[in-house]
C-alpha cells in the first residue's frame, strides 16, 4: 500500500508484530488500509505511524484533530468533517467504505485522539 505515497515527505514509523495472523479478504482490506493511510498522509504534519499488535492495527498521524462534534459521524456516507479538514477532492465516502468493509469482517474501527489522531482497527473474534 505504501508504494503509492511520497514516503520522503513524512516521517513514517512501522511497528508490526512478527506473528501476524489475520483472516480477511485481502483485496477488501487493501481498500481499508489505502483509505486510512491516504487520510494519514493527507492530514499529517510530519509523522505517521502504522502499528500492529495484539489484534489491533493503529494508523496514526500528527495532523489537525477531528472536532468532537464530528467524531461520531465521520464513518457516515457523504459526511465531511469541519472546513479545516475538508478536501475539495473528497467525496465523503472513504471512511464509510472502511466501516462497511470492517463490518463484513466483524472488525471495528474507532478514533482516539491525544497529541495524534489514531484510527484503531480491532479484529474481533
Can you describe what each PLM-predicted range is?
Residues 29-30:
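A residue-level detector for a conserved hydrophobic packing site
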Residues 46, 106-107:
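Conserved glycine-rich
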Residues 47-56:
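Short beta-strand/loop element within the Bergerat-fold HATPase_c
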Residues 40-41:
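Short helix-loop "hinge" at the ATP-lid/N-box region of the Bergerat-fold HATPase_c
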Residues 66-79:
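Short conserved segment of the HATPase_c
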Residues 21-24, 85:
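Conserved micro-motifs of the catalytic ATP-binding
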Residues 11-21, 53:
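Conserved catalytic submotifs in the C-terminal HATPase_c
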Amino acid at each position: 500500500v505504501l508504494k503509492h505515497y511520497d514516503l520522503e515527505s513524512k516521517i513514517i514509523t512501522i511497528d508490526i508484530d512478527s506473528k501476524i495472523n489475520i483472516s480477511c479478504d485481502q483485496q477488501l482490506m487493501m481498500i481499508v488500509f489505502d483509505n486510512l493511510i491516504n487520510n494519514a498522509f493527507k492530514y499529517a504534519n510530519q509523522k505517521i505511524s502504522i502499528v500492529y499488535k495484539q489484534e489491533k492495527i493503529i494508523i496514526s498521524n500528527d495532523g489537525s484533530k477531528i472536532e468532537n462534534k464530528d467524531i461520531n459521524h465521520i464513518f457516515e456516507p457523504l459526511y465531511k468533517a469541519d472546513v479545516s479538514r475538508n478536501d475539495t477532492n473528497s467525496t465523503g465516502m472513504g471512511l464509510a467504505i472502511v466501516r462497511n468493509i470492517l463490518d463484513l469482517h466483524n472488525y471495528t474501527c474507532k478514533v482516539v485522539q491525544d497529541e495524534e489522531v489514531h484510527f484503531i482497527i480491532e479484529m474481533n473474534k
